[in-house]
Structure formats: C-alpha cells, structure tokens
Regions:
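Mixed-charge, glycine-accented linear interaction segment located at domain edges/termini
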Residues: 141-144, 191-240
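Small/polar beta-strand repeat architecture
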Residues: 142-162
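Beta-strand secondary-structure signal
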Residues: 60-64, 151, 178-180, 217-221
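Extracellular Ig-like/FN3 beta-sandwich strand-entry sites
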Residues: 58, 145-149, 174-176
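Beta-strand elements of well-folded, non-transmembrane domains
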Residues: 15, 65-69, 156-158, 181-187, ...
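Solvent-exposed edge beta-strands and adjacent loop segments
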Residues: 1-76, 124-131, 193-217
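Short strand-edge motifs at loop-to-beta-strand transitions and within beta-strands
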Residues: 137-139
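Extended beta-strand solenoid/passenger and fiber regions
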Residues: 70-130, 155-191
Length: 240
C-alpha cells in the first residue's frame, strides 16, 4: 500500500541492557531514515564489471527536535541528566550602593571575590582586579563609589535543576529506539501508525544551535542484532 506521511509523533530511546528510558522527543522535524549497502565490483581482465557482491548493509535515522532536549544531549555525550548542589563561577554586573556594597545574585562559596571596575558602557576599564569581601550575600568594595558599576567574579553554590556533564572518556550507550509516525491511507484518509524500531547508538558528533529557532539535531547509527537474526530495522504499520 501507499501512504501519505502526516508527521513523526515521537522518538524514544531506551537502554538496550536495562530498559531505562534515555530520551523522549515529541517535537520532531526533518526526520529521515536512510539505508546503505557496501558493495564490491567483480571485474574481468578488461576491467568490465561482471558482478556486484554485497558485503554489508547499514541504516541511519536522523532528525531534529524543535526544542533543546537535555535527555538527547546527555545521550549524545555519553552522560546522564542529574540534579542537586553544584559549583559554578558567577559573573555579576552590579551597581554599588552606600559603603561600596551590592547584593550578589547567588550564594557565594567562601568570602573571596575579584572585582573589576566597569565603564558606563559596560566595558572593563582595566584588566587589574581588586579584592572584595563577601558577607551575608553582599560584596563590599573598598573605596567603592555609590552608583558605579563593577564586575564581580566569585564561586557560587547553586541547586541545579538539571546538569549534564560531558567527559572525554565517556562512551555512548547502545539503545533501542522507536519512532512513531502518523500516516494516512490515500483513498479514504484513514489513519495508520508506523513504528520504526531500531537498535544502535546516537552519534557523539552533536551540535546545539543556540538561537531562538535553533533545532536540536541527533543521529542514530543502527547496528544489527549480531547474536540474533542480523536485523537492522523493523517498520511496523497498523491501522489507527
């Protein structure tokens, strides 16, 4: 039969070993499933191709999520999404008040900070930093002038809602991935669902376009079930 493709409803990946859900994306754009075949030409003495031997097949599923997806990023870098206390370096641009004091935007770790004077346009007036003292969530700048702007650099303790760490020695997990696709039958526009069932790893070559219209692209390289029937992909279609 022939079908009109309406849209891809979702793509989900689970750990091939323990079945844990690794990512779910339901704002899919630009999906594509491609197959490849490695071949070798058999030639005669005159270099005429007399036969083509097939050595192996491959499959790749690629798509983008319309929004940045932390689960996909974690799967791409071989990490996981965590939460909780963590430390970051904060860069606060503050306007000094009475006594050269200003309130910090986050909870500081320790009492030390580096302060840089800023010009009216927000640029650094000097590369030299002066020391400041942090106490009760405030920075105090010695000889600070009320109304002047400063850049305060300090170590902050924050409670992260989500955190993804990319390590140089991390390995991407083997996963089972299913894409759910909405189809319509051509004659009567009856609904059908296609399930593209795959097994493989997300590519570690990932790019997060940090713009308002930047999509989160990902690519799955499919692997055959080597200890099974060497299957690469199943496409299962059912009536809605």
């Amino acid at each position: 039969m022939e079908y009109a493709l309406d849209r891809v409803l979702s793509v989900a990946g689970t750990d091939a070993v323990d079945g844990k859900v690794l990512f779910l994306a339901d704002q899919i754009v630009d999906p594509s499933l491609s197959f490849s075949s490695e071949t070798e030409d058999i030639v005669d003495a005159m270099n005429n191709v007399v036969m083509v031997l097939e050595n192996g097949r491959g499959a790749t599923f690629s798509a983008s999520n319309a929004f940045f997806n932390t689960q996909i990023l974690a799967a791409q870098v071989g990490g996981e999404v965590t939460s909780g206390a963590t430390e970051i370096t904060k860069y606060d641009i503050l306007t000094l008040g009475e006594g050269g004091k200003a309130k910090l935007s986050a909870t500081a770790k320790g009492t030390d900070a580096k302060i840089y004077a800023l010009a009216k346009d927000g640029s650094l007036t000097t590369a030299e930093a002066v020391d400041g003292t942090i106490s009760s969530g405030e920075i105090t700048v010695a000889d600070g002038t009320k109304g002047s702007k400063v850049l305060v650099v300090y170590t902050a303790e924050i409670d992260a809602d989500e955190k993804i760490s990319a390590f140089a020695d991390a390995k991407n997990k083997l996963m089972n991935v299913t894409a759910e696709v909405l189809l319509k039958e051509l004659c009567n526009e009856e609904l059908y669902y296609a399930y593209i069932i795959m097994r493989g790893k997300l590519s570690g070559e990932a790019e997060w376009g940090m713009t308002r219209d930047g999509n989160h692209a990902f690519e799955l390289r499919c692997f055959p079930e080597y200890c099974g029937d060497k299957k690469l992909v199943d496409v299962v279609i059912v009536k809605g």
